Structure formats: C-alpha cells, structure tokens
Curated annotation (Swiss-Prot):
Organism (species): Streptomyces avermitilis (strain ATCC 31267 / DSM 46492 / JCM 5070 / NBRC 14893 / NCIMB 12804 / NRRL 8165 / MA-4680)
Gene that produces this protein: leuC
Protein's pathway: Amino-acid biosynthesis; L-leucine biosynthesis; L-leucine from 3-methyl-2-oxobutanoate: step 2/4
Cofactor(s) listed in the protein's UniProt record: [4Fe-4S] cluster
GO biological process: L-leucine biosynthetic process
Name of the protein in its database record: 3-isopropylmalate dehydratase large subunit
Binding site for [4Fe-4S] cluster: C347, C407, C410
C-alpha cells in the first residue's frame, strides 16, 4: 500500500521504533524565541548538558519586541527580561541569534523560510503552535512545549506518537478577491476547531497547487486553529523556485540531488488517508470571523448567526458567549460592523505579498477617520523589501502607521494592544478573548479585507470600495 506525504517524511526520520512506544524522531531544524526557551536552557544548565546540534538550532526575537523606537531601552520589564534572557542563553550556549535590529530578525516562522532553512522533507519544531507554517514546503513541522524544547536541545530527537492523516482537497479556481486566508478560514469553519485533532492535514488539489509559497504558508500556518498537529503541502516547482538561491539552500550538485529527493515527496496514488474533506474553490468568497474562536466565521456577505440555530448545545452556548463578548447581535450584517483598529502583519499574513496586496488597495485612498491602521512586516528583511518598493510611503500617505518587524498585535505580549472594548480587523490567526489585549474584540480577515476595512471603517472587501466609488460617481460621468 502507498504512503501519504506525512508518512514518508515521518518514516524517514524515525531513529527508534518499538511496539507500544512513541517513535523517536530526528529533528532537522529547531527554531527558538524568547518566550518558550528560558526554562529549557535552565534545564540544560542544571544537567550540565550542551546544545547537541548548534548547526540545526537558530533563535530570533519576536513575541515581546516593540515595533516602534527599537533603538531605545524596552520599557516593559517582563518583555525586557525575556529578551535579555534569550540573549544571555544564546551567548552562553553558542546558539545563533538574530536580535532586534539585526537584518534577519523577525517572526520566527517568517525568518526560517526566507533564509532557506525550511526545506522539503525535513522535520521542524519550535516552542510555538504556528510552527505548522513550515509544512507549506512539504516539511513535517509542529509546535512543542518547553520540556520538549529542552529535549530537542539536548538530543536533537523527540519521542512522538504517530498522528492520523487527513486529506483536504480544494479543486477549481478561487474567485477574484478570494485569498488563501479566506480559504483557510472557510476550512476551519467547515471542520471546526477540533476537526483536525489527532491529524496531520495535507492540503491538495488544483486550487492549492496554484497558490504561491507565501499563500501556502498562510494555509499551513492556521492548521493548528483546526486542532491539527501539523499541515503539509507537497513540494513542487513553485517550492523549488522559492528556495533556489536562498542563504541556506543547497547549491550545485547538492541542489540537484535535493530536488530529485524532494520530487518524491508526494502522496502515492494508492495512499489511504484516515479522513478526507473536499472543498469547491469556486464556491468561496471573502471570509471573516464573528466570534471568539477561528471556527466562528462566515462569508463577509452573511450576517451574525443566531445561536438558536445551532442544534448542538455546546456550540449554541459558545455562540451565545461569543456574541456577548464581541458586542454583536444575531442577524447583524457583518458588513455593518465598525472597527477601531486594523492590523496587517503576523506569521500568517506579514510577508511581502501580503503587504503588496494591502498597499494596492489603500494606494490613493485614506484610512477612515477614527480608525488606526498598523502595518507590521513579518521580518526586518520583509520591511526592507517593502521600503525598496515604496510600500511604506503608500501606507503612510494613506494614514497608516508603518512599524518595525515583530509579532506585534497578534498577541498581547508587547506594546501593540487593543484597549478594552476596541474592535480590530486583523490578519493574524487567533481571535480568542483578550488575545490582542484585555477586552479587545478581534475579527480575523485577509490583508485585502483588512485594507478595505481600514478605508471604509467597517468590515468590507475590495469590491465594496468599487461599489462605493460607483455610487459617488455622478450619472453620465
């Protein structure tokens, strides 16, 4: 019987297999940041152990970093302590670190791919749930806890139970204005935030194959929001073109050998998945969340659902609580929801294609009165590229704030936060209660919807801008 993509990569990394025990996997790339690594380094220090494979370990500062005045001392004592601790630990153990101000600093899941460290057929771990991002390359990538971070630092291996596999097939053409973010939000709404629990998801089909690498990273990034262990997409010519010439990509004969191996990394025709989901791309439209988990979403053209419409009692209760927290009423058109803040950034949508898409919409327009728009590149390198293209000027002229790279408003661990009761349209990945600041209300959207929302002041798509322009044009003009 054939094997799935996930099974092939998993099997290639088994160091030890014994009946009744988890498989022991070799880890090819270990990514670190300041939040989940301090206790792991403490464990090494207490045991007198070194980092086993410094060549496979890299750290960056992202969660706590400010996005303004990065040349000044960090004001928040907790953030400052975590960053200083990471610097101390990396210096003591010899771990490569990209600190604030370094050209390669940024959100860890943006930095890995842009350096060419993330490659097909590898195993990638990080003490961060959105490590699934790297699965876009055909890598087996998943988030781990702090004790597991220590285990990998000490042994470069990890004992893991083998997950099941789920195929999510998306065929057809995505309609104009529908993005990878809309697609993954629709998938999560379809299968639920627990639908992928215990599975590695493989995204496949003609619609997936047509996506750019950055769009594929958006898809795999939010696999965890569906409850999955990881998400993967088989590597292809798009993958190879993205990697070729990057700092850590193979070269010459090694490149040829790598590509030959990478081409074998696809599910066999007779491979059997434990579950399958089929999505028609043509039926999709811009998507937004209305509630307090990523599965509580709907097409932008819809209205806030009535909790009474849910047959399942737990879903009905969750919807009631979500509407109460979000300050919404059943039947309210999603397009009528006004926002205070728009955030474009994060490891989900902070790459150069995302910034280009948002800039194309706000160019020649102004951010609505009373709305704050934050543009935060996913890495310093992305920021430099955006500046070279003049995107920073486009955003500033529209009235948006141009910031330095970092996790920023994705989570309330740095100065970029919502005030209680404030509402955001955010290109990040989680809309939990208080995720962007205590009492903050978050709607997850694509960069295109975020930009249109910033201009109109309420949840909107780029098509709404065209409709408004048409409505303002005098007859006969």
């Amino acid at each position: 019987m054939g094997r799935t993509l996930a099974e092939k990569v998993w099997d290639d990394h088994v160091v030890r297999r014994a009946e009744g025990e988890p498989d022991l996997l070799f880890i090819d790339l270990h990514l670190l940041h300041e939040v989940t690594s301090p206790q792991a380094f403490d464990g090494l220090r207490q045991a007198g152990r070194p980092v086993r494979r410094l060549d496979l370990t890299i750290a960056t500062e992202d969660h706590n970093t400010p996005t303004l005045d990065i040349d000044k001392p960090i004001a928040d004592p907790v953030s400052r302590a975590q960053l200083e601790t990471l610097r101390k630990n990396c210096a003591e153990f010899g771990v490569r670190l990209h600190s604030l101000g370094d050209v390669e600093q940024g959100v860890v899941h943006v930095v890995g791919p842009q350096l060419g460290l993330t490659q097909p057929g590898t195993t990638v771990v990080c003490g961060d749930s959105h490590t699934s991002t790297h699965g876009a390359f055909g890598a087996l990538a998943f988030g781990i806890g702090t004790s597991q971070v220590e285990h990998v630092l000490a042994t470069q291996t990890l004992p893991l139970a083998r997950p099941k596999t789920m195929a999510i097939t998306v065929d057809g053409e995505l309609p104009d204005g529908v993005t990878a973010k809309d697609l993954i939000l629709a998938i999560i709404a379809r299968i639920g935030t627990g639908g992928g629990q215990g599975y590695i998801l493989e995204y496949r089909g003609s619609a997936i194959e047509k996506l750019s690498m950055e769009a594929r990273m958006t898809i795999c990034n939010m696999s965890i929001e569906a409850g999955a262990r990881a998400g993967m997409i088989a590597p292809d010519e798009t993958t190879f073109a993205y990697l070729k010439g990057r700092a850590h990509a193979p070269e010459g004969e090694e490149w040829d050998a790598a590509v030959a191996y990478w081409k074998t990394l696809k599910s066999d025709e007779d491979a059997e998945f434990d579950a399958e989901v089929v999505i028609a791309a043509a039926a999709l439209s811009p998507f937004v969340t209305w509630g307090t988990n990523p599965g509580q979403g709907a097409p932008l053209s819809a209205s806030v659902p009535d909790p009474a419409s849910y047959e399942d009692a737990s879903e009905r209760f969750a919807a009631e609580k979500a509407l109460e927290y979000m300050g919404l009423t059943a039947g309210q058109p999603l397009r009528d929801i006004k926002v205070d803040t728009v955030f474009v950034g994060s490891c989900t949508n902070g790459r150069i294609e995302d910034l280009r898409a948002a800039a194309a919409i706000v160019e020649g327009r102004k951010v609505a009165d009373g709305v704050r728009m934050l543009i935060v590149p996913g890495s310093a390198r992305v920021g430099l590229q955006a500046v070279s293209e003049g995107l920073d000027v486009v955003f500033k002229e529209a009235g948006a704030e141009w910031r330095h790279a970092g996790c920023s408003m994705c989570l309330g661990m740095n100065p970029d936060q919502l005030a209680p009761g404030e509402r955001s349209a955010s290109t990040s990945n989680r809309n939990f209660e208080g995720r962007q600041g205590k009492g903050g209300r978050t709607h997850l959207v694509s960069p295109q919807v975020a930009a249109a929302t910033a201009v109109l002041g309420h949840l909107a798509s780029p098509a709404d801008l065209a409709d408004e322009n048409a409505a303002r044009t005098p007859a006969g003009v």
